[in-house]
Amino acid sequence: MQRLGPFSTLYGRVLAPLPGRAGGAASGGGGNSWGVLGSHVQPPGRAQFGVGSTSTSSGDANSVCPAPSTMSKAEEAKKLAGRAAVENHVRNNQVLGIGSGSTIVHAVQRIAERVKQENLNLICIPTSFQARQLILQHGLTLSDLDRHPEIDLAIDGADEVDADLNLIKGGGGCLTQEKIVAGNASRFIVIADFRKDSKNLGDQWHKGIPIEVIPMAYVPVSRTVTQKFGGVIELRMAVNKAGPVVTDNGNFILDWKFDRVHKWSEVNTAITMIPGVVDTGLFINMAERVYFGMQDGSVNMREKPF
């Protein structure tokens, strides 16, 4: 792991993340539990894996809220990671994939600053409604995969990163479009704060692996996943509307709270082959490099092992 020194620049004010689209597309939450005989079923909101972790990351509904100082350090760490990635990888005349979530806000702000300062010619491809609005609000050039199917660089956040740079993504409900953009990029760079760095998936992130499904298939998909791999499935429910979260693609999100370490490449392939599954929040062997903003103001960089 390479440690980058702290930035000395005094950063300006950062825009807060945009709310999810109407209907709760980016909202998280609990939901209906679909356990089956022989599966390991626990109440919604309870950590399914990594019990005993002292992480302050969100995920366990019964955990004590972290102190404000911890949260401010996490937000500053996101800013550090986002700016480091932009400084090291964004160049003139690139087509950029812009991720979704709270961390990407800081990267987009720095991209906009560099465009103004250096007169960069950049084209931005969004991964969600939120990303599209960020691009427009910061005066960047918006495009899509129809016009620019080849992306030079994609930058996005993650809910958790393991030792092999496998990711869990989709806490904000944008996993399918995020995976499409990352998969069409020559380079995929991830930015995150110190809370997202884990040895194994599930050590820090306790909300499970998101699975986007066609609405009519959410019950059979839930049963099939738990029968094959154990754990418990929850249909993600919206916060500001009655009913489930609806993605930007008009689908539902299942959160699979697994109860043990798996061979994630095999699991990802098996789940995506289930009829009704659109995609999963497992990003396997996709990230080239991850920047972690740390509590001490430094940035740790990890590259994909070979």
UniProtKB/Swiss-Prot annotation:
Recorded catalytic activity of this chain's protein: aldehydo-D-ribose 5-phosphate = D-ribulose 5-phosphate
| Protein known as | Ribose-5-phosphate isomerase
Q: Which gene encodes it?
A: RPIA
Q: In which pathway does it act?
A: Carbohydrate degradation; pentose phosphate pathway; D-ribose 5-phosphate from D-ribulose 5-phosphate (non-oxidative stage): step 1/1
Domain of life, per UniProt, equals: Eukaryota
Q: What is its EC number?
A: 5.3.1.6
Record's keyword annotation contains Phosphoprotein: yes
Q: Where do Polar residues bias regions lie? A: 51-61
Which NCBIfam families does the annotation name? PRK00702.1, rpiA
